[in-house]
Amino acid sequence: MAEVELQGSGPSLQKRLMLICVSVFVGIAIFMLPTPAGLSETGHMYLALLAALLIMFLTEPVPLPIVMVISGISLIVFGIGETRAVWAGYAHPVVFFVLGCLMVAIVAESVGLTDRLGRFILRYTGTNVIRFSFISCLGLGVSSAFMHDIAACAIGIMAMLPLMKAAGINVGSRTGAFLMISLPFCCSAGGMGTLVGGGRNMVSAAFLQDLTGIEITFLDWMIYAFPACLVAVPAVWFACFLVFRPDRTICFIDLTEEQKAKKPFTVDELKALAVVALVFVGFFTKNLHGQDYSIIVMGGIVLMVLIGLVDWRILNAKTEWAVAVLVFGGGIALGTAMGTSGAAEYLASVFFPFFEGKGWLALLIGVGVFAAIMTNLMANIAAAALILPIAIPLAIMEGVDPTIVAMAMGMWTSFAYLLVIGCPPNVVSYSFGYFKSSQLTKAGLVAMPVGMAVLILCALTWWKIIGLV
């Protein structure tokens, strides 16, 4: 049974112009307010622009890639950022990392690996869409702790898409949005489980060591965070389920006897698995060779094309360049400008005094909430560079173990669920067009507090048991 498609081709021209006018009016109104003490004129201009852009993010009067082009142009025209610095964000290493992971997933699909994965999951879940979603989100979410959240998300989506299309789950449908939002959310939540699950974890550990000399090893981080990961992944999935209430009558098409039969891997599948394994080895040994993740994954793509696993023209045609470069790159440029304009530092100076002198739990929640909100707008490296130099000395001054602050930075930023640009898995899933950015925000407003509640519960129970607090 197919669901009725809920979204059309987009708002009418009249509605688009009205939404743009509302966005511009809000931005002008905020800019006309007196500049608060401690905030520069440039920072004030940035916050006014950000307010206008947030309305466009949520209403999409024009496609989101175009909104992010408007963002870059505005940063330059209004003097918030220099031309080269702004456009450099659109070519950030993380952009190429996102592109590379998308391409790896496309290659995995073309050689049949994602189809094999989808059939493997169906054997154990049956055709029920809800059960399939829960098992795949749980498996890929927990796997994200070891294989990087964006890679797990991209491979999972490519395995799920053919099943969704065959079942008649349309773009814009409630069930389609549920499937395509719950997976990146769960992969992001799972990424907190170990140091290699996401760059945010390693950045937080590195800042802690630089500022205090305290080292968090791979095993330390796993002991602190992996139990929370095991609880957060299903909790976030359930939050998405409550928001979208997917149609329980929809089922995937059952496997034929031939499809159920286990077949040996083809030569191309084995070649692809070998290259993917090399890429993951590169991820795990990054501290030894020092190469960026983008270099590792793009090197894998070069190797895949070189050995004939995929035709470049097919790879070029299937890759969502605009979403990766314009949406995620634009988000990085916008986040960088938040730091250089002084707006981020001002917001931190307003926010953190509320949590001073109130103990480790208040500091944990304060750092975590602020970090989770900020990482929706700026890269986690930039957020860590802003927050940890303020929060770690504050923790030491109050007699709180600074490790708690670093863990909060890495773990709470796993819930960047409010905007598409918040984290790479969101961008990857959005690129397939199954949901609007406003739908992701709607789900994030529920899933984000649920994930945070899990982390607070973990701190009050597990961290006390192991003696971290």
Question: Language-model segments: what does each one mean?
Answer:
Residues 1-97, 212, 220-349, 446-452, ...:
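Hydrophobic transmembrane alpha-helices of multi-pass small-molecule transporters
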Residues 54-63, 139-149, 184-196, 282-288, ...:
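Transmembrane alpha-helix interface/packing and boundary motifs in multi-pass membrane proteins
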Residues 72, 150-164, 180-181, 193-211, ...:
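Re-entrant/interfacial helical elements at transmembrane boundaries that shape
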Residues 93-103, 145-152, 187, 221-237, ...:
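Alpha-helical transmembrane segments
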Residues 170, 226-227, 330, 334, ...:
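C-terminal transmembrane helix pair
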